[in-house]
Curated annotation (Swiss-Prot):
Organism: Sordaria araneosa
Localization in the cell: Membrane
Bilayer-crossing regions: 41-57
GO cellular component: membrane
Known cofactor(s): heme
Protein name: Cytochrome P450 monooxygenase sdnQ
InterPro entries named in the record: Cyt_P450, Cyt_P450_CS, Cyt_P450_E_grp-IV, Cyt_P450_sf
Binding-site list for heme: C491
Biological pathway: Antibiotic biosynthesis
Keywords, ordered alphabetically: Antibiotic biosynthesis, Glycoprotein, Heme, Iron, Membrane, Metal-binding, Monooxygenase, Oxidoreductase, Transmembrane, Transmembrane helix
Region described as Disordered: spans on this chain: 1-23
Biased composition (Polar residues): 8-23
CDD domains for the chain: CYP503A1-like
Amino acid sequence: MDDPSIASGFQQGTGRTTGANGTQIQREGLDGLLRQYPIQCIGTSLLVALLTTIIIYYSSSSSFPSATIKKTPPIPEINPLGGIFYPSKTKAAITAYLTNARGLVTDFFRQNPGKLAAQLHTQIGTIIVLASSTAEEIAHDERFHLRKQTAKTFNAHLPGFEVFRDDYNNHLMKNVVTKYFNKQLTKVTGILAHEMDLALGELFTTAKEGQQWTEIPLHATALQIVARLSGRVFLGEDLGRDPEWLRITAGYAGVVTMAFADLSKWPAWLRSTANRFLPRCKASREYMDGVRRKLRPVIAQRRKERRTSSREYREYNDAIEWFELESNGNAYDPEIVQLSLSLAAIHTAGDLLAQTLTEVATHCEIIEPLKEEMRGILAKGGWQKSSLDKMILLDSVIKESQRRKPLATLSMGRIAVTDAKLSDGTVVPKDSTVSIDAGLMWDPSIYAQPDEWDPYRFVRQRKGSLEKQRLAELTTTAPEHLAFGHGMHACPGRFFAANEVKIAMIKILLGYDIKFADGVEPKVMVHGITLDPDRRVRLSIWRREDGHGGF
C-alpha cells in the first residue's frame, strides 16, 4: 500500500473538524508545569532553570516543528510559524493545519501557479508539499523513498509500530504481493463470495421478532468483513476464520493509527516514554503480542514438517507459505510480515468499503440500478473475476466514493534520500518529508461539480478515448486520482482490495436493504490532512426474504 494514508500519517477531507487537540495538550503540559512551580516561590537560579526547561520543552515540542526541522528558505511556507518568541503565531499556524489543511494547500497553489513546492507545518513536523503536476515527475524517481517516510512518520523504532519499519520484512512483503498474491485473483473470487456469506451470517444479525431493522456499527463491521475475507486468502480456512485472529487483526488496524495520533502529541524526545503508558499504544503492543502467540506455533510446525520429511510435506497455498518461499532461507520476521499484510488490506479496503456503503445508503436511488447490473452479470458469468470486471456501474460507484473521501488529501508520501532538484530548479533537501497534493481529485476543471457524489461519473468517462476508459477504472492510478498512490510505489494490493470491496457490496446489496436512520448525516472527521470516517455511525439493515437472490 502506498500509504496515502497509513502511509502519510496525516490526511484531510471535507466535513466536520475535530479540533486542534494536539495543541491543547501541549498548552496543558506547560500550564501544569507552571502550576507546579509558582513563580513567587522560586529563587533566581531556579527561575532561570525553569525558563530554560520551558524553552527546551517548546523547542522539542511537536507544536514547534520549526525548531527541530531544518528550514529550507527557498521553499515558501504555507502556514509560517512564529518560533519560540511568537508562540501565538505558531499556535495559529498549527491550528490552521489541523482544521483546514486541504484548503491551505489548495489556496497556496492556486495563488502561486508557478510554484512546485511549499512547506506545510504540521503538529509532528514539516512536509514539503509538491504540486499535483509533479506526480508523474517523481512517480518513478528513486531519490524519493516510500518506506523511509513511513518509518519516520509512524515512529517505527518503537514497540507496537514495527510493521512500519523500512527493513527486509517490508521489501519481502511487496515481493510476495506482486509475485504470488496478485496471481491468485482469478482463483479466489468464488472462495471470497462463499466466505462473505459466512461473514454476513455472523456480522449482519437478522432482525429480532417485531423489529424490522437492525443497526450495526458501520466502520467496525467493514473492518471485520475485510479482515475475514483477507484472512481466508492469507491464512486459509482454519486460521483465517479463527475468531481470536480476526479480533487481533481488525483490532490492530482500528487502533494503530489512533495510537500514532496520540503519540504525535508528545515531543519526539518523550515519545519512547509516552509509548509505554498511552492506552492505545499499549493496545497496539498487546495486539502484536497476540499475533505472535497465534502464528509462532503454526510456523514452527510447518518448518518442522519441511525439515523432517520433504516427501510428506503438504504444500500450502497461503501467505505463510509464500513468505517462506520468497525469503529463500534469509532471516525475516514472519509475524510482522503477516500483520503488515493484514494491516494494509484491512486499512485500505475496510475504509473504502465503509465509505462506499455510506454513499450508497445516503443516495438510495442508486441501489436498484446496481442490483440490476449485479444480477444480470452474475446470471451469465457466475462468480468469476471477469464478472466483477464487467460491473462498470459498481466500479464507478466505488471509485467515486474513494474520490470524494480518500484516506488523505496528500498522497505519495516519501523521504528525499538525497538533495533532489525538481524540473523548475527547486531543490528538495535530503531527509525532507515529501507528499503530493491530491487536490486534482476535487478540481472542477477535471471533475464537474466535484463536491457532488456522482455514481455515473466514471461510467460516462468510459465512453471517451481509450486512455479515458483506462483512467476510469478503479485500480488505475493517475495524478487526478491519487487515492492508491501512483508510480512505482502505488499500492500493490489495490487489485485485491477492489475485488474484496466489490464482492462485499454485491452480497450486501443483494441480500439486505440498507439505510441510515432519519436525521443521520455521516460526517468526515478532519484532522490535518487525515480524513477519517465517523466511527459512531450505525447502518440500519434488513435481511430480505429472498436472501441473496440466488447469488
